Amino acid sequence: DWPKGLVMDMWGSATIRTAGEEFAMALHLAGLSPRWDDGSDRVSGFDILPLALLNRPRIDVTLRVSGLFRDMFPGLAQLFEAAIAKLAERPESAADNPYLVQTPRVFGPRPGSYGLGIGAAMDDYSDEARAAAGEAWLAASSYAIDARGEITYARDALETQLTRADSFVHLQDLPETDLLMAEDYAAHEAGFAAAMQRLGKGGAAALYHLDATRPDQPRARTLTEELARVVRARAANPDWATGMMAHGFRGAAEIAATLDHLAAFAHLAGVVPDHLFDLMFDATLGRDDLVDFMQDANPQALAALRARFDALHRAGLWSSRRNSVLAELGSPA
């Protein structure tokens, strides 16, 4: 089945690098195509693709844009809203055209505001903190951008679109990074999952991470699949950890931060299976040489690493049945 409602997480930096690949995807999913200006090679408008040519229903796309995207590409937000206004006028059935229901579909943070403001809620593994993270995501996404570029508070419209969503998509184009190298990925992707849970729709939307690091071979993976790929390829790869040992204090900090970011996905979205944390434990505290290195180079990072594993275990986000792990954590077997 085709997805019925899809939320796209739009970042300004990625839009610059890909020349708007994500936005073009949003247009195509809605059954639209960009109209190009021959003189400048810029997008000057849009064309509506007929259903007969699409051979599928139009997909209800909601754009959650970052503050940077809002400021750098106001024309794209306006273009999308203008296009869906025209779709609302089409003589098509509601089953084929969800845009017959007229409502804002481009949302972002308050003017002048950036980021999601999840903060400490990512590190506190209580239900209350998860709810606070979801509320922060909603609050930072509650301003609608219309076809004239006017930005208004539209929390109710946002929540309505989210409750209809069955898919969430984030695209990554940078080959030199991954979703465990910065907390922003967890804040945006797992934060959406926390927001859905806040609305009583936890698990209703599938979470997808699109890999566009090789433009000629794009890959779509579930968020769990992408996390497993990154853990096995880098985070739990002994060669990577050994490489970090050459960077002293900073290398030890990167090892600890990688676990922090994986933990945030587990806390906010529940998408990290136990065996991935087992792999992380084996690759870090399970290596005597790595523990000795961190103790010498950055004992604070080592203490943070141990505390993070312990907090995950105590919160029930990671359950290990291995006595050696439980002994290292100081927990009863």
Regions found by a protein language model. Name each.
Residues D1-A333:
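Ligand/cofactor-recognition surfaces for anionic moieties
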